[in-house]
Amino acid sequence: TTYNLARMNMILRGIPYRNFNIYNGDTLEHDYFGDKKFRVQVANPPYSANWSADMKFMEDARFNEYGKLAPKSKADFAFVQHMVYHMDEDGRAVVLLPHGVLFRGAAEEVIRKHLIQKLNVLDAVIGLPANLFFGTGIPVCVLVLKRERNGNADNILFIDASKDFEAGKNQNILRQSDIDKIVDAYQRREDIDKYAHVATMQEIEENGFNLNIPRYVDTFEPEEEIDLNEVAADIRKLQSEIKDIDAELKP
């Protein structure tokens, strides 16, 4: 079904069938592309899907350098490893994933640390609003991966775009203005109050390679300060008014 929907989507967008190749298969279990490398990859894989995590993959070039495989019940990082392997020397990749990949421990922590510390391919983490996609209401994040980081090798950009959307009847919608704001923040690559932060590798390491966005982008809105003297005066005034009313009601 997904295969046919993908083909229909291309045709409806006016792309001739001779100009695209769509294959239906399990890309983790059977790597159709072999050693082929790509300059650009975009993916929205099934979130926290099951996969075999067979030990044979420890000899697979896509996974063996990490020393760990993604858990059987959460193939998220397996898709990331697959994409990183197929990036060419100037390759870029963008992948949508659940937020759990940013902070879950055990094998996923090992893989995350390797991507950051050894390969240094993670360029940005972007948090999106909840309920953007059919079939799931969970908020997702975008991982931007780049083989050549062009002067940004000592930092990772975090963007919290989770509050910018238009609420729809069945799902939320990213407006063009919301998309433009994300793109502008990514291109500027600087701290923006309550929206974006450029985290140094030292910060990342001090946080134990935990990439949970609230650790880096503070969106906390302080509560309005309460003037206790003013509150006390209001209470005294009310008490006086109540006393006057009681006096009027007495026979």
Q: What feature does the model see in each segment?
A:
Residues T1-K36:
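S-adenosyl-L-methionine
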Residues D31, D35-P251:
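A conserved structural/catalytic subdomain of Rossmann-like adenosyl-cofactor enzymes
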